[in-house]
Amino acid sequence: MDTAKLFVAGLLGGVINFFLGWLVWGILLMDYFSSHTTNPQVARSSENMVFWALIGGNLVFGFLHAYILYKANVKTPASGAILAATISALVTLGSNLMMYAQYDLLQLSIVLPDVLASALVSAIVGATIGWYYGRGPLNKTV
């Protein structure tokens, strides 16, 4: 296992996941999710956000993507996007349905947009990691 390549891919995936998550859930879908949550007061305000945990969680997802794509021998952006989006959609759908069943936090109308948003973000993360894994040596001569 090329741990250096896996480490760089994990960092790359985590950083991209963080910024895309901020854009998608923190800006684009924030109002929709707030209006379809059963208790919006449980969400932390920007001032009370625990950023070390947010950054850590995004890095974990970046390394998870990097590890799965490494083990699947992904070497192209397209194959990385497809595999990452598929896994993300399934994990998000499963976890959202279990949360809906057990907690009074969200309405069912949140599930599909969240699954689609997660798949989109993961597709971009997976495409980037697939590109990184498939690129040739940097010192190639012509």
Task: Give the positions of each predicted feature.
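Juxtamembrane/disordered regions of integral membrane proteins
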Residues: 1-142
